[in-house]
Design a protein with these regions (language model features):
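A short acidic, Gly/Pro-enriched loop at the edge of an enzyme's catalytic core
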Residues: 111-120
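N-terminal, positively charged/glycine-rich alpha-helical extensions of SAM-dependent methyltransferases
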Residues: 1-26
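Conserved alpha-helix/loop element of class I SAM-dependent methyltransferases that forms part
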Residues: 24-51
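Short alpha-helix
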Residues: 198-215, 219-223
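Acceptor-substrate binding/catalytic loop of class I
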Residues: 154-165, 190-206
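Conserved class I S-adenosyl-L-methionine
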Residues: 149-185
């Protein structure tokens, strides 16, 4: 297990050096209006006033601070990249926003955080970095108070079975083992070095069953959209901020979202 964490941490440390200054993350716009959350996840958020929130796999903290902008009383960001958390702390300080940062792997329960949060949040490109979803869910729910909620919005598993041109099935839908690749550039920084990364595909059942099979967890909502809030491919846009794959419009889901409650 340590090997995959070391390989992927090296990748994300490198990306965290580049992403805060990328056009994709647009630091100038964020300083003017610290809000990067999209309609999919915002539709699931409760009233945040008075809430203590943990953002899992927060990268360098833009979404974390966006939760603060929406009125959260206290925000915490958790990530395994020390470079990312250094950037997150600098971003918060530059905006004079209060936030807390935790250096940890998302699947390893941090005892000091257990039972502390009203809401645990995770968004876009999170679960595929883990070989097994159950430990991730166990950690997320451990951090919630009774009655607290988990909200996840992520790219749909169907998207990950297709080749780079979205023309052919190139990868398994089910988790048949690690997918080892080398990639040059990142989704935000094309100049990123060529580096190895390890990922896993997970069917929807792997994501939902750790919730519905547990007697202290209640799946409140599950939804899918045939559009993405991110333009990460050659796209068409039937509405502002809703991107579909050009030539594949409406054929399959691009994003799923869920809300679950700790009983």
């Amino acid at each position: 297990m340590k090997e995959y964490l070391d390989i992927n941490r090296k990748l994300w440390d490198h990306w965290a050096d580049l992403h805060p200054r990328s056009d994709f993350y647009d630091a100038v716009a964020f300083r003017k209006n610290p809000m990067t959350l999209h309609e999919i996840e915002r539709a699931l958020l409760p009233e945040l006033a008075g809430k203590k929130i943990l953002h899992m796999q927060c990268h360098f903290g833009q979404d974390t601070l966006s939760l603060k902008t929406l009125g959260a009383a206290e925000v915490w960001g958790l990530d395994f990249s020390p470079v990312a958390l250094g950037e997150a702390a600098a971003l918060a300080q530059g905006l004079d926003m209060e936030a807390n940062w935790v250096l940890a792997n998302a699947t390893e329960i941090q005892e000091e955080l257990v039972g502390q949060f009203d809401l645990v949040f995770a968004s876009y490109g999170v679960l595929g970095w883990h070989p097994d979803i159950k430990p991730w869910m166990d950690a997320a729910f451990s951090y919630l108070k009774p009655g607290g909620e988990l909200i996840v919005a992520d790219f749909h598993p169907v998207l990950w079975i297709l080749d780079e041109n979205f023309e052919h099935i190139a990868y398994p839908y089910f988790n048949t083992g690690v997918i080892e690749e080398e990639r040059e550039g990142s989704y935000a920084s094309p100049e990123a070095q060529r580096m190895k990364n390890l990922t896993w595909n997970h069917p929807i059942s792997d994501i939902v069953l750790p919730i519905v099979e547990h007697h202290e967890r209640d799946l409140v909502y599950f939804g899918e959209t045939n559009w993405s809030p991110y333009e990460l491919f050659e796209s068409t846009s039937p509405a502002p901020g809703r991107y579909q794959i050009k030539g594949r419009e409406g054929l399959f889901p691009l994003v799923y979202s869920l809300k679950a409650r700790k009983l």
